[in-house]
């Protein structure tokens, strides 16, 4: 294994196996219930530590100014915990789509927090690191904590859970869905009754954002219509990605082989423990 100073750190994708919207609070945020799992399909980040006091990212993401880049913002948040001139050049191998509902930006931010917490020797406990992550986005803490979780509230209440391991075919429609736009929309269904985790384990899962996204983004509706011919399918998060689950890898790959030219997709295994935390356990071993 590479030494921590030159190794690649994974930033895994996530799926929301369901997303139930229970209501909207007076502050505008939504009460949700959702189930997060990780996939073994990842962005990869290398962190080249220096004492320049600068945070540099290569290649720069097109159309994303540095101060809006979650990797940059995560590193700058962490720098506040040291008086040393900490610097880093982050090398990003971007494989997860942006605006896809599989957590690409949030996962990159979490991996930056976790890796630099170690490499910069800041050594914040995981609770503090997750709280920093929450400042960057509602999904960042689950990536920081690194275990499949049932989430409630505005996503801040996380119950670690074990989910039966399956294989997933994820399709990536050629569109970018704005999470903020979907949650602002007057037609979003916001009245799914809350259930406890024991009740939810019985199934009847759905995604309350899916009907609205299908209506406003024909590419998502078209992808779901194609995929549902082969297996029960749903959208993850606020989209645009959609997924179907399979018991065996070969079943998922057989459907992937049939994918039409207007679609992209990948097959990945569902994980209860984040690939990031598998690496972290090796680093601290």
Curated annotation (Swiss-Prot):
The active site is at 14, 139. This is 4-diphosphocytidyl-2-C-methyl-D-erythritol kinase. Keywords: ATP-binding, Isoprene biosynthesis, Kinase, Nucleotide-binding, Transferase. The keyword Nucleotide-binding applies. ATP binds at residues 97-107. Disulfide bonds: none annotated. InterPro entries: GHMP_kinase_C_dom (IPR013750), GHMP_kinase_C_sf (IPR036554), GHMP_kinase_N_dom (IPR006204), IspE (IPR004424), Ribosomal_Su5_D2-typ_SF (IPR020568), Ribsml_uS5_D2-typ_fold_subgr (IPR014721). GO terms for biological process: isopentenyl diphosphate biosynthetic process, methylerythritol 4-phosphate pathway; terpenoid biosynthetic process. NCBIfam families: ispE. It holds the Pfam family GHMP_kinases_N. Belongs to the GHMP kinase family. IspE subfamily. Its EC number is 2.7.1.148. Pathway: Isoprenoid biosynthesis; isopentenyl diphosphate biosynthesis via DXP pathway; isopentenyl diphosphate from 1-deoxy-D-xylulose 5-phosphate: step 3/6. It comes from Tolumonas auensis (strain DSM 9187 / NBRC 110442 / TA 4).
């Amino acid at each position: 294994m590479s030494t921590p100073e030159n190794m690649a750190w994974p930033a895994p994708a996530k799926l929301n196996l369901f997303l139930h919207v229970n209501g909207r609070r007076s502050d505008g945020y939504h009460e949700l219930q959702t189930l997060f799992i990780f996939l073994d399909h990842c962005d990869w980040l290398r962190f080249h530590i220096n004492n320049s006091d600068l945070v540099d990212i290569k290649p720069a993401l097109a159309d994303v100014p540095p101060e809006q880049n979650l990797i940059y913002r995560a590193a700058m948040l962490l720098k506040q915990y040291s008086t040393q001139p900490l610097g880093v050049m982050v090398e990003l191998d971007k494989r997860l789509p942006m605006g896809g509902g599989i957590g690409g930006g949030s996962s990159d931010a979490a991996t930056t927090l976790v890796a630099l917490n170690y490499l910069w020797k800041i050594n914040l406990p995981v609770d503090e690191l997750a709280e920093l992550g929450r400042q960057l986005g509602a999904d960042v803490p689950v990536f920081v904590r690194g275990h499949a979780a049932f989430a409630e509230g505005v996503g801040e209440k996380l119950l670690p859970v074990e989910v039966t391991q399956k294989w997933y075919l994820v399709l990536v429609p050629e569109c970018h869905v704005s999470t903020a736009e979907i949650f602002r929309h007057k037609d979003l269904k916001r009245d799914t009754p809350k259930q406890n985790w024991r009740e939810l384990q019985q199934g009847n899962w759905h995604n309350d954002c899916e009907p609205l996204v299908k209506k406003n983004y024909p590419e998502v509706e078209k992808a779901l219509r194609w995929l549902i011919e082969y297996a029960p399918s749903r959208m993850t998060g606020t989209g645009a990605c959609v997924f179907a689950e399979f018991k065996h890898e070969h079943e998922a790959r057989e459907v992937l082989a049939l994918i039409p030219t207007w679609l992209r997709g990948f097959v990945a295994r569902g994980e209860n423990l984040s690939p990031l935390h598998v690496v972290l356990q090796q680093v601290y071993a």
